């Protein structure tokens, strides 16, 4: 069995099962079995798979066909050009969340200290700490997620401290920038999620209460306690979350509250400036 034939067979199986991106998935799973970089698939199409490589590739395809996310099989997802370990305890970082990074770099490029609330893999805290050359603190309720985030920070040499607590309740600050991509799926929508999300990703990372915006109303007052005057609070929001999250900013000392949409044109990032 050559690389070329293995790719074709993997593609056929995944495409027949109706899975998204069958070619890319077959490539990623085969590379994982071969322990190679992507270029190898095209520079060595006649490479004969060893028995072990073939067995591993077959097992990965089988797991994917049963619904397991590719990133849970390879245990890695790229975010803003860097590899992040993922686990069943962490949300798989999404490309849409890179929009928050871009907005934070544009809006708060001078931040020296930042806080990421609900850090998961650490994707936001680590990326922003490295891009801004800032010191970061990141929180999560999940001990297992924080273990993964700590691993990622060490692997990427990012200056991030991790704290297990409810939102930012254990912290004193001050911070120049607070970011958060909290759970924001309304309870009624959980059943409608793709099975690969609903059945494999942690509900602690997904479920945002009845409306999906309640957690933002808890974060905003905490940010008021922690931000330096003039500092920014920047949220990722769900596609229906804008009005509810704007409401969270409405009664406090917030100015320059504004929304940006992602590449798909969906409301994605809402920010406000703490102006006491
Ligand atoms: C949507 S995920 C975002 C993860 C990561 N920031 C990202 O963008 O990929 C939300 C994260 O918030 C954490 N979380 C949920 N409720 C929390 C709470 N009350 N306090 C702290 N973290 C919480 C979850 O464990 C999860 O890691």
Describe the predicted segments one by one.
Residues 30-106:
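Conserved AdoMet
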Residues 92-192, 218:
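Conserved SAM/SAH cofactor-binding pocket of Class I
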Residues 29, 153, 181, 197, ...:
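Conserved RecA-like P-loop NTPase ATPase core
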Residues 210-273:
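Conserved Class I SAM-dependent methyltransferase catalytic core
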Residues 83, 135, 159-161, 255-258:
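Conserved beta-strand segments of alpha/beta enzyme cores
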Residues 7, 26-27, 54-58, 70, ...:
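A general structural signal for well-ordered alpha-helical segments in protein cores
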Residues 1-42, 46-49:
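Non-catalytic accessory regions of SAM-dependent methyltransferases
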Residues 184-215:
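Mobile active-site "lid"/loop adjacent to the S-adenosyl-L-methionine
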């Amino acid at each position: 069995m050559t690389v070329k034939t293995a790719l074709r067979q993997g593609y056929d199986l995944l495409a027949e099962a109706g899975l998204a991106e069958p070619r890319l998935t077959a490539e990623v799973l085969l590379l994982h079995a071969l322990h190679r970089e992507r270029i190898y698939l095209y520079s060595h199409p006649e490479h004969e798979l060893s028995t072990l490589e073939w067995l591993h590739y077959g097992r990965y395809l089988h797991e994917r066909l049963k619904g397991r996310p590719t990133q849970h099989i390879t245990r890695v997802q790229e975010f803003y050009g860097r590899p992040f370990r993922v686990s069943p305890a962490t949300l798989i970082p999404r490309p849409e969340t890179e929009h928050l990074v871009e907005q934070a770099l544009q809006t708060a490029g001078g931040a020296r200290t930042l806080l990421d609330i609900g850090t998961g893999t650490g994707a936001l805290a680590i990326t922003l700490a490295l891009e801004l050359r800032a010191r970061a603190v990141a929180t999560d309720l999940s001990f297992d997620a924080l273990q993964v985030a700590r691993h990622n920070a060490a692997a990427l040499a990012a200056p991030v401290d991790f704290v297990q607590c409810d939102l930012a309740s254990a912290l004193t600050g001050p911070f120049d920038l607070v970011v958060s991509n909290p759970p924001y799926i309304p309870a009624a929508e959980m059943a409608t999620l793709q099975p690969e999300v609903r059945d494999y990703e942690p509900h602690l990372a997904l479920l945002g209460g009845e409306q999906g915006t309640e957690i933002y109303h808890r974060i905003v007052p905490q940010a008021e306690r922690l931000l330096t005057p003039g500092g920014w609070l920047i949220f990722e929001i769900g596609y229906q979350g804008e009005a509810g999250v704007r409401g969270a900013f409405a009664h406090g000392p917030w100015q320059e509250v504004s929304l940006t949409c992602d590449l798909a044109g969906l409301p994605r990032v809402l920010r406000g400036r703490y102006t006491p």
